[in-house]
Every structure is written in C-alpha cells, then in structure tokens.
C-alpha cells in the first residue's frame, strides 16, 4: 500500500467462509491482526493475533482469505482484539477504532487438497 510518512496502519487477514461458504456460521475467522504499523514496515507493528496460514478443512470447498489495511487516526492503545478468532467482525473492529474504510486490500482463494 502507499503509506503516508509518519502514519500508522492496521493489517487484518480474515476468512469469511468458516466453516464453509455455504454455512458461514463462524464468519469471520481472523488469521492475523497487527496494529500500529509504521508506514509499510509490518514488523514494526503490535501483533494482536499471530499469523495462521490458510488451511480449509476437507469438504468445505473454496475459502476466501481477505487482507485489509486501514490507516489509523492515531496510535491504538487498546490491545484487545475481541476474544476468539471465530466470529470476528472486521467492521466492528474498524468502527471501534475509528479506522474508516480500508486503504488497501487483496484476497486469495484456497481449498483442501485431497
């Protein structure tokens, strides 16, 4: 993403298709959450949730893995991500911390390899 000098960012990775796209009762599962990233230096941020790679269970079809970057209005001091990884609501997190709309995003799809 095009980072502004001196700005702080949040990076989140979620899977909205848990346990499956047809039955997403645990939507969203967050795989990674980092706050207070200085510019594009991800390693400078505070990790609230360690990275867990993609790994859809057998028989659940394609899963979308979504990366979103938000520009922060200032430093986030609340280091609670909201509890469990399942049923994480990225919009709720963004609203709580006044993040506005994402400034960057990307996604990929994966399915279980038989």
From Swiss-Prot:
InterPro entries noted in UniProt: PEBP, PEBP-like_sf, PEBP_euk, Phosphatidylethanolamine-bd_CS
Signal peptide bounds: none
Pfam family, one: PBP
Covalent S-S links between cysteines: none
PROSITE patterns, sorted: PBP
Family listed: Belongs to the phosphatidylethanolamine-binding protein family.
Protein name per its UniProtKB record: Protein D2
